[in-house]
């Protein structure tokens, strides 16, 4: 086992990366090794998909399936070795199909297929034991003894960034947003990474290419969400329980939430969001359901306690999943799509009757708690509608600075920085937030600036697209570069979606971003220095010192 993709991976003077019987996330060495083989097989699929395109062969099924399968290897998504093996077997079948089609087309056109890499010709062993024995040969840090550690670091930056983009591609696909040009670019990059490139300049360029590709993917996802569910509107959300039977929906998939709301109408079941599903309350086509009663719980790392105390059924639509046996709620948990845990019920298709039956069999909440409301729904359209008023307050000198404080949450005590930062930000500053990092402070009171709330919840992690649109609008209004705006991004990272959003911001030319709580373990000190110099990236430090430096600039 070797896994170094998330923020909580082992980092000591002697060891970097999880390389023992179990990773810090809870996945076993078996699952980790199987995921490595799946990724390698997917790189072979991408080689033949790219080669097929040269012969005008496009397989929509494979194009849409491949990023989804890659998504299954993202942190805290799938811990089930049987499911990973099934995906790997399917990948091998797709690879063989594409290879056969390309070979036939090449023969018919009298084309010589030269320079076929090992990743394209590799044959998947025919048993789980043989696959596991083969896994060390395709570990994500393969070749580490032959190349400089900076090469491995940049390969991983690209691989993990592309994995984050693949996750957003799958979220978009669920909402019927697909794009063959983006799939072609994905396959080209994935296949190239499978050849173990060594040129640092090319790898850096590739990371920027991934960032720009992801910007287009986030635009697709924004289009899918707003076309399907309407543009989010500022909406108050109760974060306390309501008496009655209940279902909790966690993850990111708004499609699943809608299906659950439709199928629970009139059944006396209250539906709650959790974690990154909180922004769902702002969408007109979702908030119209009166039994979508509120949000329960906070960020992913608290789920083992919060889910254990939730007296109903729980649906995990995407990341982040933790071991449900710790809180003894595995019998009330249902996974969807690429999510998996051994022994936990998995739902294929859109029939949630099992979830409903489970919810009706549970006690539910026995009484109402005193309501506590927070506000969500400040996504792209709402932000753009508010832009004239915001610009006016800036011109009057009432808004001096903008902060975007958000990203992934996690366990580390250092993450209290983000709570303290928002608390100490001057009252003439506006704070935008997104992703689950918001749970560090989104129940606190921030007041307003002449009617404009000081805390604006932009949405899920992918709604960084909305924040970018506001920044571009402000830059246009003030006739300046985006880096000349009184705007500072203060981001927290945990997994690969955060990595690709950072690459997107870098690729768009955004500089001076503060990141934390720690640097990615897969980046060497030399690579961190290069990124800091090239993009003026800064590590978070002391809140007071950071605020002083930001506001003095």
Curated annotation (Swiss-Prot):
Look up the EC number in the record and give it: 1.7.99.1
Which SUPFAM superfamilies did the record assign? Answer: Prismane protein-like
**Which Gene Ontology cellular-component terms appear in the entry?**
cytoplasm
CDD domains from the xrefs?
Answer: HCP
Q: Which Gene3D superfamilies match?
A: 1.20.1270.20, 3.40.50.2030
Protein's GO biological process = response to hydrogen peroxide
List keywords of the entry alphabetically. Answer: 2Fe-2S, Cytoplasm, Iron, Iron-sulfur, Metal-binding, Oxidoreductase
Q: Which GO terms describe its molecular function?
A: 2 iron, 2 sulfur cluster binding; hydroxylamine reductase activity; metal ion binding; peroxidase activity
Per UniProt, [2Fe-2S] cluster binds at 3, 6, 18, 25
Output the InterPro entries linked to this UniProt entry.
HCP/CODH, Hydroxylam_reduct, Prismane-like_a/b-sand, Prismane-like_sf, Prismane_a-bundle
In its keyword annotation, does this UniProt entry include Transferase?
Answer: no
Q: Which reaction does it catalyse?
A: A + NH4(+) + H2O = hydroxylamine + AH2 + H(+)
Residues at which hybrid [4Fe-2O-2S] cluster binds: 252, 276, 320, 408, 436, 461, 495, 497
Using the UniProt record, give the first listed, main subcellular location. cytoplasm
**Cofactor remark:** Binds 1 [2Fe-2S] cluster. Binds 1 hybrid [4Fe-2O-2S] cluster.
Identify which cofactors the protein needs according to its UniProt entry: [2Fe-2S] cluster; hybrid [4Fe-2O-2S] cluster
Please tell me which top-level EC class this enzyme sits in: oxidoreductase
- Name where it's found: Cytoplasm
| Pfam families per the UniProt record, alphabetical | Prismane (PF03063)
Keyword Metal-binding carried by entry: yes
The PTM Cysteine persulfide maps to 408
Similarity comment: family membership: Belongs to the HCP family.
Protein function: Catalyzes the reduction of hydroxylamine to form NH(3) and H(2)O.
- What name does UniProt use for this protein? Hydroxylamine reductase
- Protein source organism: Vibrio parahaemolyticus serotype O3:K6 (strain RIMD 2210633)
């Amino acid at each position: 086992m070797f896994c170094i993709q998330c923020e909580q991976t082992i980092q000591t003077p002697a060891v970097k990366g999880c390389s023992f019987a179990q990773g810090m996330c809870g996945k076993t060495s078996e699952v980790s090794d199987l995921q490595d083989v799946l990724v390698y097989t997917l790189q072979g699929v991408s080689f033949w998909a790219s080669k097929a395109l040269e012969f005008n062969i496009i397989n929509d099924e494979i194009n849409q399936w491949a990023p989804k399968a890659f998504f299954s290897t993202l942190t805290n998504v799938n811990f089930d070795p049987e499911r990973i093996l099934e995906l790997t077997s399917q990948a091998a079948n797709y690879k063989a199909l594409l290879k056969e089609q390309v070979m036939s087309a090449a023969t018919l056109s009298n084309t010589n297929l030269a320079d076929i890499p090992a990743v394209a010709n590799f044959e998947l062993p025919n048993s789980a034991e043989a696959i596991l024995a083969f896994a060390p040969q395709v570990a994500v840090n393969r070749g580490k003894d032959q190349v400089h550690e900076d090469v491995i670091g940049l390969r991983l930056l690209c691989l993990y960034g592309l994995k984050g983009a693949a996750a957003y591609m799958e979220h978009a696909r669920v909402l019927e947003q697909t794009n063959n040009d983006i799939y072609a670019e994905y396959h080209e990059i994935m296949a190239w990474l499978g050849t173990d490139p060594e040129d640092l300049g090319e790898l850096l360029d590739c990371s920027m290419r991934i960032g720009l590709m992801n910007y287009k993917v986030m635009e697709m996802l924004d289009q899918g969400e707003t076309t399907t569910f309407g543009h989010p509107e500022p909406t108050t959300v109760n974060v306390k329980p309501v008496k009655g039977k209940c279902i909790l929906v966690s993850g990111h998939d708004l499609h699943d939430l809608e299906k659950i709301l439709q199928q629970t109408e009139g059944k006396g079941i209250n539906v709650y969001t959790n974690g990154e599903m909180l922004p769902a309350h702002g969408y007109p086509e979702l908030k119209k359901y009166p039994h979508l009663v509120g949000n329960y719980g906070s960020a992913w790392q608290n789920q083992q306690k919060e889910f254990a105390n939730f007296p109903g059924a729980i649906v995990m639509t995407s990341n982040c999943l933790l071991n449900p046996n710790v809180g003894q709620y595995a019998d009330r948990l249902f996974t969807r799509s690429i999510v998996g845990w051994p022994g936990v019920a998995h739902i294929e298709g859109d029939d949630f009757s099992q979830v409903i039956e489970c919810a009706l069999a549970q006690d539910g909440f026995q009484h109402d708690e005193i309501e506590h409301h927070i506000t969500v729904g400040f996504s792209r359209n709402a932000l753009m509608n508010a832009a004239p008023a915001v610009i006016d307050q800036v011109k009057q000198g009432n808004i001096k600075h903008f902060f975007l404080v958000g990203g992934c949450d996690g366990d580390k005590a250092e993450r209290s920085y983000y709570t303290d930062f928002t608390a100490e930000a001057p009252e003439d500053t506006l704070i935008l937030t997104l992703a689950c990092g918001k749970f560090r402070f989104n129940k606190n009171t921030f007041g307003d600036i002449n009617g404009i709330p000081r805390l604006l919840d932009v949405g899920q992690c992918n709604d960084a697209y909305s924040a970018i649109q506001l920044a571009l609008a402000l830059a246009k209004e003030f006739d300046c570069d985006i880096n000349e705006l009184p705007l500072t991004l203060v981001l927290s990272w945990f997994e690969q979606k955060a990595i690709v959003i950072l690459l997107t911001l870098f690729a768009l030319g955004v500089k001076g971003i503060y990141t934390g709580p720690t640097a990615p373990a897969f980046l060497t000190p030399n690579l961190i220095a290069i990124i800091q110099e090239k993009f003026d990236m800064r590590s978070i430090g002391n809140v007071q010192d950071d605020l002083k430096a930001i506001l003095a600039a």
